[in-house]
């Protein structure tokens, strides 16, 4: 069974009197920085000078420094910039300025797990990974709640790395909801596998193929959109709130029977075998290698795929349907 920590298992004491540098002030960086400050901790921000994020952080009362200057004065460094930007920033603006005994925190294990960032031996390397977007991290904190998170230790130079990870988790409100101990490998691999075979890749293609089948059979695209995409939220909300069995108890008997008899014939053992093939690509590092090479080429393949997604018929119909539902196009 997984080890789960709550508020009673964590303390802010390891962070008291220390300077925390949050590198990045995007959706996660801003939320975590604000929560940590509201928890009574000293937080500074490290950014490229002059950008919109710099001005926003200053306007919200933070001391803001260029990344290297923030790292040089920090005891705890939270690397909250996008994964693919991290290796270059690490090499040029973080690693040369780290203090011995510093604590380096990541919100995702990708660069550490796949060896794109190699920290020196004289620092702690930890991960605190909220399992929600930054907006929810902040909103739940302000409401007196929190979002769940994962914590992991990659390198324990101080002997207290887990305590630092739990302190950060407590400071951002995650221990209010529950924090699961994991490893960098497990977090990275399950995150990527889940995105590819279910949450982004699998779900997206399932919806698109269902839409295509209905339209090819002569049904109106607008009706098809509602049936396979719009109503997906209703089902996912039930699953999120009640679990899969609870969702089944929340739909009609006709939906139950149809879903339970037809679903396994579509998502069958052959699909499961394909899922495993692509999961193993993640585990072996093959996907990471492919993605790093793609990013180095300027993301040309990704741009083409995004354009194809943008122009799919479900998006053309969806733009009009979202205006009807929400009064404007939702990005």
Swiss-Prot record:
Judging by the UniProt lineage, the source's domain of life is Archaea
Q: What class of enzyme is it?
A: oxidoreductase
Q: Which SUPFAM superfamilies match?
A: 6-phosphogluconate dehydrogenase C-terminal domain-like, NAD(P)-binding Rossmann-fold domains
Residue ranges annotated for the KARI N-terminal Rossmann domain, each copy included: 2-182
Give binding positions for Mg(2+) 2: 191, 227, 231
Q: Which residues bind Mg(2+) 1?
A: 191, 195
Task: Please give the PANTHER family that the UniProt record associates with this protein.
Answer: KETOL-ACID REDUCTOISOMERASE, MITOCHONDRIAL
> What job does this protein perform?
Involved in the biosynthesis of branched-chain amino acids (BCAA). Catalyzes an alkyl-migration followed by a ketol-acid reduction of (S)-2-acetolactate (S2AL) to yield (R)-2,3-dihydroxy-isovalerate. In the isomerase reaction, S2AL is rearranged via a Mg-dependent methyl migration to produce 3-hydroxy-3-methyl-2-ketobutyrate (HMKB). In the reductase reaction, this 2-ketoacid undergoes a metal-dependent reduction by NADPH to yield (R)-2,3-dihydroxy-isovalerate.
Identify this protein by name: Ketol-acid reductoisomerase (NADP(+))
- The protein's organism comes out as Pyrobaculum islandicum (strain DSM 4184 / JCM 9189 / GEO3)
The gene it comes from is ilvC
